[in-house]
Amino acid sequence: MARLARVVSPDTPHHVTQRGNARQFILETDTDRLVYLDLLRRHGALHGLGLLGYCLMSNHVHLIVVPARHDSLRLALKHTHGRYAAYFNARFASSGHVWQGRFYSCPLDLPHLWAALRYTELNPVRAGMVADPAAYHWSSAAAHCGDDLPGTALESNARIRGH
């Protein structure tokens, strides 16, 4: 049976999640996270994917993104996750899948955008890693609170339809 086509609405925020294969830790070190963010920013810029929010956990990622075109989401994440898998496998002299299946994505209306951002940025609080979401270096919470931590710069000019 063929899988259903992904629903992508250009200029609309989307919540994206992707988990490590078999829930393995794939973003363990600061270097891993910096590599992932660099790839995401580079391929996002190349393929028209704006980044509004994110949280990088050890075994999964949450992204709030805005695709400029119907193929922006697919292409940016294909190249980001493909290149990250190559980095990860080279680091561990391994081969095979790094990510578990397809990434999940869902278009968001404005009320759901704020709920998804809260959910995303509260992930490390729920996991007991920090008490304040802005204290977690690997999410967009600090940037949204006005702190200028390295690695938290977001796409400020992502166009959102109707807003």
Language-model features, listed with the residues they occupy:
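Short Pro-Cys-Gly-centered "Cys-loop" motif that presents a nucleophilic cysteine in a tight turn
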Residues: 1-57, 66-163
